[in-house]
């Protein structure tokens, strides 16, 4: 998570929570003139289009006042979806036993991409079973993590 993403998460957690939603996480993707702020929300009863619209209005109001992003961007608010992104240790703990796809910031054993089942979470270390071997990953070295949907 970048410094800006950390700042945005801290800024938006309370307003999104006040609406009754969990701020699962967010991503700010810079793509030249077309940057995007993706905000993922969840609720115990699921997320519907109306929920995304309500959260989007609230987030837009906060962003207009605080103005933390200096470039033009599009705001996308959605549920985490089938390929749910994992941002916090609690997310990994919630999905112990599920398959996850990881992309690392710094390679481990000459690999940046890993896929396996989440075995356990111990503080800031996630253990994933990859091809029968238990591999430990520091959350600080995980650039991107998503659940792998089962069909």
Swiss-Prot record:
Main location: cytoplasm
TM stretches of this protein: none
The entry's keywords: Cytoplasm, Ribosome biogenesis
GO CC annotation terms, alphabetical: cytosol
Claim: Transport is one of the keywords in the record: no
Subcellular localization: Cytoplasm
CDD domains, per database record: YlxS_C
Superkingdom per UniProt: Bacteria
Pfam families, per database record: DUF150_C, RimP_N
UniProt record, GO biological process: ribosomal small subunit assembly; translation
Presence of the UniProt keyword Nucleus in the record: no
Family: Belongs to the RimP family.
Function: Required for maturation of 30S ribosomal subunits.
HAMAP family the UniProt entry points to: RimP
Stored PANTHER family: RIBOSOME MATURATION FACTOR RIMP
Name of the protein in its database record: Ribosome maturation factor RimP
Organism encoding this protein: Aliivibrio fischeri (strain MJ11) (Vibrio fischeri)
Gene: rimP
């Amino acid at each position: 998570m970048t410094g800006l993403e950390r700042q945005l998460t801290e800024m938006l957690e309370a307003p999104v929570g006040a609406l009754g939603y969990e701020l699962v996480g967010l991503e700010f993707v810079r793509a030249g003139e077309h940057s995007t702020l993706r905000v993922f929300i969840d609720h115990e009863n699921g997320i519907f289009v109306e929920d995304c619209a309500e959260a989007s209005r609230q987030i837009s109001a906060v962003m207009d006042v605080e103005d933390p992003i200096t470039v033009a961007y599009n705001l996308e608010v959605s549920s985490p979806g089938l390929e749910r992104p994992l941002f916090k240790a609690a997310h990994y703990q919630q999905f112990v036993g599920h398959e996850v796809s990881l992309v690392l910031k710094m390679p481990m054993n000459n690999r940046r991409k890993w896929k396996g089942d989440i075995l356990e979470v111990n503080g800031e270390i996630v253990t994933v079973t990859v091809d029968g071997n238990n591999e430990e990953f520091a959350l600080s070295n995980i650039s991107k993590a998503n659940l792998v949907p089962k069909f």
